[in-house]
Amino acid sequence: MLFRSERYSYHMIKETGEFVINLTTEELLRATDYCGVVSGRDVDKWEKMNLTPLASKEVSVPAIAESPINIECRVTEIKELGTHHMFLAKVVAVQADEKYLDEKGKFHLEYSKPIAYSHGTYFSLGEELGKFGYSVRKEK
């Protein structure tokens, strides 16, 4: 994770040494954008975006209950990279919303309608493009 030292989240993570990566979805798009723009110094983003704190299993900081995947992390190293600091971390727990699991326990990412952010734009994900190894399979 990369943060500028001016960011509120930078100081929270540096103080606790922990953070949670919450997978974001089309349903959470507005909250995702809002939380990326508005500082937690000024606003309770949980309340404003009607998000539910979820107790983490291994870290002291909460996850977002509405997120289909929560990845709990502990900081192992901080590297200064010019204007940003890179927080390297170890994943210590993962929680998955059971509504996206099939009967065999496989998580179906595509059902959660994940989004990605690149260069100021949000993108929808989820369309299957190919299975692992497709490039070397023999044509029938």
Language-model segments: which ranges?
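Basic, polyanion-binding surface patches
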Residues: 1-140
